[in-house]
Amino acid sequence: MTHKPRVICLGVATLDQIFRVDTIPEAPAKFGALEFIVTGGGMAANAAVAVKRLGGEAQYWGRVGDDDVGDQILRQLEREGVDVSHVFRLPGARSKTSAILVDNRGERLICSAPAQGYPADTSWLPLGEVQHADAVHADSRWKPGAIALFDAAAAAAIPSVFDADAGDPEEVLTIAQRATHPVFSEPMLKSLGFGAPDVAIPRAFGGRNVICGVTLGERGTWWFDGERL
């Protein structure tokens, strides 16, 4: 029987309302959408869905309010086959939702209603499960959770992937160096103040890193392995 890699994904999950339009307006206006989709979103949640669609087994670990939006977020993940048994439902909290305009060139405009009532506490995380996983993934939206997960992954000697998309530069760099495979967005890497990507990636490399990468949109992806870029 073929082994299915098991990946734990920790971080944000949202409910995205996506409006496809010809162009994103630059001035106030009323206009109709070409298409409307309601779907799950959030970096960690989407990573879990990607793992499942690629043939792996995925668990999503994160915090969700006990509101209607939270119910919809979990239904979307369950429909994709993602294990949500370790999601922490927070009484009285507001789950995160976003309205997203996407034009015909693929450009986007996002307006998010942030989650409310999400404590930073990590004591509920079932970190003993990490030893049974093949890899872990975390985004930058819940930093204490990412640190706890990456430390558990290091103890279990398994790879850890960090989606370094946004946040305080010093905090994000600290977390990135606790992962084996951090990948920065280009704006996040720029915010570190290390210069152009080919200079910044080697400077960001450190700690537990096996590789350190950056996504550059249509220009592709660069990574540094400690010797070569």
Regions found by a protein language model. Name each.
Residues 1-13, 75-89, 100-229:
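Ribokinase/PfkB-type carbohydrate-kinase core domain
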Residues 70-71, 95-97, 172-173:
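Short Asp/Glu-rich motifs
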Residues 91-93:
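Short, glycine-/polar-rich solvent-exposed loops and beta-turns at beta-strand/coil boundaries
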Residues 47, 96-98, 210:
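Residue-level marker for the onset of beta-strands and adjacent loop->beta junctions
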